[in-house]
């Protein structure tokens, strides 16, 4: 390597060091805007597997949080909700001193989890770029295309600032990949004087950071072990890789020692957190496998064909970059310029194949489960994207390092247009009603019960009003169709929603399991008998709500129900719409089709005016 090349490389690395902090700031600002613009509902786990247990942890068991069966049976690690519980407490402490009493405090508590998640998402994008820099070079056009693919990816825009455990898992995974010693996939460097390979590990602290972050990702989502098992397997065996291995016995011993220490540290932290949260020693990973595999409860939430990830999952997370991602998986090393780069790219490609292949064997599948692979896919697809959309002019004496020129502009603008359309539609127009209806109910509660609102704020949202037994809202819709206490906020805002707990009391492949119908199923199977004989039966002791919330398709059932003797004996003689929310152009679940409506039952005072539909 010439001195000019070395000098140029040093300048590029110095420039990258200077730009790192500025890029991180700008990326986080983009993700904060991203979080602010997300005004739609996607999946229940965004709230019920993170924010609800976090709310319960921050404000106590009387705060009204909804803990699903997974938390009652310790299937989830407490580390994820503990992160948001901390930000809840900090936000409540600061806002209580700035705004001792005021409805703006509720707005702050709704917003702070998304703000924290935006920072986490920004870190994921930034580390994706830095991992690409470590692979392709500090001044490589390809590195910036990896960042470009992350920033303009509609799936990333739609999901990265949502409080899914998969979103945090994605960031932890790419952070761990960045700190991983990829030089172990390089080639042994020997000399005639010393035929033994030189020490290859550059920094033990980077290795420890990688192992701790990887262990944390595995504790958070046990299936993340597939990614790291693949990387370690190829590092040790070098299957289909080039060049002699730089691994020595001492390096292998160091890897094993550090893996044991770092893994034990994270397991100890996780165990202590779970002991504190649940009140006794438990191992959520075992419980997760026991309930979902041994008792086959995962299939209760849906079955998908074996090819789901190949034909739906990868296209959804890649969208317009899919052709480049497919090409890179077919020939991951086509643009490699060194042996180490060849081996790293091949390992990343095999990581995608192994993870997708293994997860395809599991009956219950969701796109979110392969979300941690997105940074690797962006990095693999970046060379193909860069070569398609840019050309490199030949250097001249006056311009020895010419900037790449954009080409195929028509395709570029079409791809960007499609991405922006998808991101915009999903962010604003696809299922906004579940969030809007809770804001409406919260504001109505603030209007009708100002004393209870003041009590909630002075008690830091941890105390129920003593003499308030009003059922404020009844949700007659598929279970978990809206967020819960993270958006309702006030403990005194009592609400009831149809449940859908799996049949924990049954065994797989039994008539009891096959014929099981949860509460939401029973409502949609036969709505009027369900309402008269089950939901409002004397044994249920459910009071008549102030509001009923549901999708527009249930209105004929409600009108029929209020004509029954059972409803009229409860004082429920009419329902009238007072709020209506647009919920998108389509929905894959027929039960959620159409607008969402709030009906007033007329049994309480201070009712709002009728909403014209």
Swiss-Prot record:
Main location: endoplasmic reticulum
Superkingdom of the source species: Eukaryota
GO molecular function: alpha-1,2-mannosyltransferase activity
Entry membrane topology: Multi-pass membrane protein
Keywords: Endoplasmic reticulum, Glycoprotein, Glycosyltransferase, GPI-anchor biosynthesis, Membrane, Transferase, Transmembrane, Transmembrane helix
Chain ranges passing through the membrane: 22-42, 83-103, 106-126, 132-152, 168-188, 216-236, 252-272, 280-300, 309-329, 342-362, 369-389, 411-431
GO terms under cellular component: endoplasmic reticulum membrane
Major enzyme class: transferase
EC id: 2.4.1.-
Annotated metabolic or biological route of this protein: Glycolipid biosynthesis; glycosylphosphatidylinositol-anchor biosynthesis
Cellular compartment(s): Endoplasmic reticulum membrane
A GO BP entry: GPI anchor biosynthetic process
Glycosylation positions in this chain: 19
Purpose of the protein: Mannosyltransferase involved in glycosylphosphatidylinositol-anchor biosynthesis. Transfers the third mannose to Man2-GlcN-acyl-PI during GPI precursor assembly.
Database matches in PANTHER family: GLYCOSYLTRANSFERASE (PTHR22760), GPI MANNOSYLTRANSFERASE 3 (PTHR22760:SF4)
Family: Belongs to the glycosyltransferase 22 family. PIGB subfamily.
Protein name as it appears in the record: GPI mannosyltransferase 3
Species name: Gibberella zeae (strain ATCC MYA-4620 / CBS 123657 / FGSC 9075 / NRRL 31084 / PH-1)
Organism ancestry: Eukaryota, Fungi, Dikarya, Ascomycota, Pezizomycotina
Originating gene: GPI10
């Amino acid at each position: 390597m010439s001195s000019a090349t070395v000098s140029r490389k040093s300048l590029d690395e110095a420039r990258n060091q200077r730009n790192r902090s500025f890029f991180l700031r700008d990326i986080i600002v983009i993700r904060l805007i991203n979080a602010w613009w997300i005004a739609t509902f996607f999946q229940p786990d965004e709230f019920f597997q993170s924010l609800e247990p976090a709310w319960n942890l921050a404000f106590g068991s009387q705060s009204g949080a909804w803990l699903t069966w997974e938390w009652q049976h310790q299937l989830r690690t407490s580390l994820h909700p503990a992160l948001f519980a901390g930000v809840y407490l900090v936000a409540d402490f600061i806002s209580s001193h700035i705004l001792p009493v005021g409805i703006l405090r509720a707005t702050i508590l709704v917003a702070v989890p998304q703000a924290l998640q935006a920072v986490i998402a920004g870190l994921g994008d930034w580390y994706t770029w830095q991992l690409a820099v470590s692979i392709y070079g500090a001044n490589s056009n390809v590195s910036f295309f990896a960042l470009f693919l992350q920033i303009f990816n509609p799936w990333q825009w739609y999901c990265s600032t949502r409080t899914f455990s998969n979103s945090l898992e994605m960031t932890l995974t790419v952070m761990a990949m960045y700190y991983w010693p990829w030089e172990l996939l390089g080639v042994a460097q020997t000399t005639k004087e010393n035929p033994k390979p030189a020490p290859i590990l550059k920094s033990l602290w980077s290795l420890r950071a990688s192992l701790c972050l990887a262990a944390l990702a595995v504790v958070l989502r046990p299936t993340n072990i597939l990614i790291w098992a693949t990387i370690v397997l190829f590092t040790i065996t070098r299957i289909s890789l080039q060049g002699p291995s730089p691994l020595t016995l001492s390096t292998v011993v160091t890897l094993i020692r550090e893996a044991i220490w770092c893994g034990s540290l994270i397991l100890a932290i996780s165990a202590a957190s779970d002991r504190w949260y649940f009140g006794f020693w438990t191992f959520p990973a075992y419980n997760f496998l026991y309930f979902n595999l041994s008792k086959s409860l995962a299939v209760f939430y849906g079955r998908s064909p074996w090819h789901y990830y190949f034909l739906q999952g990868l296209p959804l997370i890649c969208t317009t970059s899919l052709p480049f991602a497919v090409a890179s998986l077919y020939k991951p090393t086509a643009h490699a310029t060194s042996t180490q780069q060849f081996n790293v790219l091949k390992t990343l490609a095999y990581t995608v194949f192994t993870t997708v292949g293994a997860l395809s064997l599991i009956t219950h599948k969701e796109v979110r489960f392969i979300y941690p692979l997105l940074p690797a896919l962006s990095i693999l697809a970046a060379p193909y994207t860069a070569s398609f959309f840019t050309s490199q002019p030949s250097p001249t004496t006056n311009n020895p390092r010419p900037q790449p020129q954009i080409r195929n502009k028509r395709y570029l603008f079409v791809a960007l247009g499609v991405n922006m359309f998808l991101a915009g539609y999903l962010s604003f127009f696809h299922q906004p009603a579940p969030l809007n209806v809770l804001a409406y109910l919260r504001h109505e509660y603030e209007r009708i019960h100002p004393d209870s609102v003041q009590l909630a704020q002075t008690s830091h949202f941890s105390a129920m009003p003593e003499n308030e037994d009003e059922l404020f809202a009844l949700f007659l819709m598929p279970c978990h169709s809206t967020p819960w206490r993270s958006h309702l906020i006030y403990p005194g805002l009592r609400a009831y929603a149809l449940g859908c707990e799996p049949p924990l009391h049954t065994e797989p492949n039994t008539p009891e399991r096959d014929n099981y119908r949860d509460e939401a199923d029973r409502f949609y199977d036969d709505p009027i008998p369900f309402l008269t004989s089950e939901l409002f039966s004397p044994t249920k002791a459910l009071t008549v709500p102030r509001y009923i919330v549901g999708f527009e398709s249930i209105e004929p059932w409600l009108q029929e129900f209020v004509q029954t003797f059972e409803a009229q004996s409860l004082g429920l003689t009419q329902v009238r719409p007072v709020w209506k929310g647009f919920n998108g152009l389509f929905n894959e679940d027929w039960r959620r089709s159409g607008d969402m409506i709030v009906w007033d039952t007329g049994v309480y005072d201070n009712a709002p005016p009728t909403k014209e539909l």
